[in-house]
């Protein structure tokens, strides 16, 4: 039995609190998350998408970085339904990696960057991702998992590389306090591929197949704060 517009609105008590002129119904976008990013870049290219310690990235810049990392991941074998673990704090590289995986039709799997080796291991055993984009501070933690659980491909992220130049230079000052601060933000990550190598790739060809709205985008294990 069809329901009338007046009957439908009567069930939405919150409508009474909308400001005048606020639409009660909107048309939802039908594209993928990457399509939405691309649309924002086309419409608001020069507007700021990300601000990180004062370093600003516009929507146009973000889309280009996403496309470059997507090409780098494609060369690493990532494609449709490939599961890619992301283990980073909130930083620009995290946003870029997220959309780059989705551009390829891959599946993002978020890990809490402060998990213990056992907690990471349980999650890897469950989702079986064999490639991970990882904060340099987490690489050593993953190395303490059982060898058969550690992803064969690790891409390391130095979050300080996304900071303004003045802060990056400041983190090189030869003082105890600065050394401690830098040590809290970045570690050496041998036998990994630096994220910057992906950013150095040419943008992925626009003809590369895109995911559909029915494609799996994320396997979400964390509480949603990452």
Segments predicted by a language model, with ranges:
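Flexible, non-catalytic linker and terminal segments flanking ANL/adenylate-forming cores
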Residues: 1-30
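AMP-dependent adenylate-forming
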Residues: 9-15, 20, 35-61, 187, ...
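Conserved AMP-binding/adenylate-forming core of the ANL superfamily
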Residues: 27-29, 36-38, 46-91, 95-99, ...
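Conserved pre-ATP/AMP-binding loop-to-beta segment of ANL
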Residues: 45, 181-221
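Conserved S/T- and glycine-rich ATP-binding loop of Class I adenylate-forming
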Residues: 62, 84, 101, 132, ...
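Structural core segment of the AMP-binding/adenylate-forming
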Residues: 76, 103-197
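Alpha-helix N-cap/start motif
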Residues: 80-81, 108, 213
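Helix N-cap/beta->alpha junction signal
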Residues: 88-90, 135-136, 215
